């Protein structure tokens, strides 16, 4: 594709995204599907360029002055050296790292100035491309041997099931994916899922399951015994979860709709409950740079309250002596350690071990938090 047509599609993507409400990754995917003449090399160029523009949009707009047309933004972007631009002492701190001031100040209130700058800068880089192998169907070394010479891969250092690709590929088109040998999942997300240390024969409830990513990660621990329930308020997510469970060969799991009458019979019966709570998603901004421009920091109190309500509701399903895992993909103490303290003060539970805190600045993974609690044996 010529430079003219690449720039043509780039402008169509940027302008089109600005007028709709889809997440950036889904919008790009839909556009590519509708424009099949765009080759793989140009698809990669368009995606990487758009993601980089959105990562640095705050600084780009600052340098643009009053005009903010996409054409002008793109011209500024092409002259921007992102490795040095943030070092300009004349720039306001939030502009230098290309974050909205409200979100920057919110992060700073929890992490302090130095850690906030470090976090914001790494959030403006590309996240690693990580997958998790399905041990019900294969093992990590077998897949790495299979891909040797075709792709550049390496094993994750902390997740025994993780593999990191040097470059993004058409993973969903691979036979290995269609056969259920792997799923895309950040290494940090895998580690959070492994906090659910379920044993064969136990009962597990994934209370905010979404499309089932974390269930797919811990399901193998039950050795195809016991029962896993996937619950979510979003029916379309559960439809996708059902497809993924089938592809992975997981047969001891069932979908639990939000209004399912069976829910009442499950209270006080679960050995494990996972609460992957709705959150700001601040730990995943490398993958979702558009989110930071949509986030209203004034909503943090509402988010905290929602997390507390969900945790209290989920706790009702844990049997006395059972365990509940609270997890977020956030790096904000407001959603993590502050909530952990609130739960301990307001429920008959105790903390099991130390919480898991993952930051892109330390571990290179996405930012996650996870804490395991045990329900009082006298509660019912």
Q: Which ranges hold each PLM region?
A:
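S-adenosylmethionine
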Residues: 1-380
């Amino acid at each position: 594709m010529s430079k003219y047509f690449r720039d043509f599609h780039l402008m169509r993507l940027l302008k089109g995204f600005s007028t709709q409400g889809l997440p950036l990754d889904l919008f790009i995917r839909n556009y590519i599907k509708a424009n099949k003449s765009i080759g793989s090399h140009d698809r990669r160029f368009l995606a990487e360029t758009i993601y980089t523009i959105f990562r640095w949009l705050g600084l780009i707009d600052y340098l643009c002055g009053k005009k903010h047309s996409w054409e002008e933004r793109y011209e500024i972007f092409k002259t921007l050296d992102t490795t040095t631009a943030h070092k300009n002492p004349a720039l306001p701190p939030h502009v230098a790292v290309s974050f909205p001031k409200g979100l920057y100040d919110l992060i700073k209130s929890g992490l302090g100035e130095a850690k906030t700058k470090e976090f914001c800068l790494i959030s403006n880089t590309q996240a690693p491309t990580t997958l998790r192998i399905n041990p019900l169907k294969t093992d990590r070394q077998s897949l790495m041997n299979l891909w040797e010479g075709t792709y550049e891969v390496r094993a994750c250092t902390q997740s025994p099931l993780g593999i990191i690709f040097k470059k993004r590929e058409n993973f969903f088109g691979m036979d290995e994916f269609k056969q259920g040998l792997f799923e895309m999942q950040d290494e940090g997300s895998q580690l959070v899922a492994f906090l659910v240390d379920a044993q064969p024969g136990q009962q597990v409830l994934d209370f905010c399951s979404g499309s089932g990513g974390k269930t797919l990660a811990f399901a193998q621990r039950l050795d195809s015994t016991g029962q896993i329930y996937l619950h979510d308020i979003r029916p379309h997510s559960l439809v996708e979860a059902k497809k993924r469970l089938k592809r992975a060969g997981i047969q001891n799991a069932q979908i639990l709709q939000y209004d399912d009458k069976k829910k009442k019979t499950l209270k006080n019966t679960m050995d494990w409950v996972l609460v992957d709570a709705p959150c700001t998603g601040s730990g995943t901004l490398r993958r979702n740079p558009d989110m930071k421009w949509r986030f209203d920091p004034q909503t943090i109190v509402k988010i905290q309250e929602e997390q507390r309500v969900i945790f209290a509701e989920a706790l009702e399903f844990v049997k006395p002596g059972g365990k509940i895992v609270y997890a977020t993909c956030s790096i904000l103490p407001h959603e993590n350690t502050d909530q952990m303290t609130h739960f301990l003060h307001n429920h008959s539970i105790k903390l099991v071990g130390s919480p898991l805190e993952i930051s892109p600045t330390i571990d290179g993974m996405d930012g996650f938090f996870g804490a395991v609690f045990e329900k009082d044996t006298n509660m019912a």
